[in-house]
């Protein structure tokens, strides 16, 4: 049974049902349907922590998908998997690729900021406050962009920007 049919989570089940309906009723070329099915299965595997399987599905979806907007979400999800695996440099590559195709993807900007902030925290722990400030400044820039696109989101980031004097 495909991963997309094994979900026990209500939201995952709902997504799977809606995705299957979309695949049946929305007129799409067979290649687009296959790409969407791989994307759906990748999301399902990812939600279950099956990251290797998720990546396989996402890579196959990327091979088939031609629409830049849709590709941006696949790339974003590949970035999420790499973030979950602690592979921050790889994650950043995929977030940047997603943003090249879809510059108004606030979640990619937010995750990029989170990685920059994390690297700033690491620099502090290593006794390098100058490098930390560079990372924190980069995080601030990405968060400002994300907040501009989604003003009601990223409240913790907004607070951090205000507290550190980087909001302006």
From Swiss-Prot:
BP terms from Gene Ontology: photosynthesis
Which ranges does the UniProt record give for the TPR repeats? 35-68, 72-105, 120-153
| Superkingdom of source | Eukaryota
Q: Which Gene Ontology cellular-component terms appear in the entry?
A: chloroplast thylakoid membrane
Looking up InterPro entries in the UniProt record yields: PSI_Ycf3_assembly, TPR-like_helical_dom_sf, TPR_rpt, Ycf3/AcsC/BcsC/TPR_MFPF
Keyword annotations from UniProtKB, A to Z = Chloroplast, Membrane, Photosynthesis, Plastid, Repeat, Thylakoid, TPR repeat
Q: Which residues form a coiled coil?
A: none
Query: Is rRNA processing a UniProt keyword of this protein?
Result: no
Membrane topology per record: Peripheral membrane protein
Localized where? Plastid, Chloroplast thylakoid membrane
Q: Which HAMAP family match?
A: Ycf3 (MF_00439)
Similarity field: Belongs to the Ycf3 family.
UniProt function note: Essential for the assembly of the photosystem I (PSI) complex. May act as a chaperone-like factor to guide the assembly of the PSI subunits.
Q: What is this protein called?
A: Photosystem I assembly protein Ycf3
Which gene is this protein's source?
ycf3
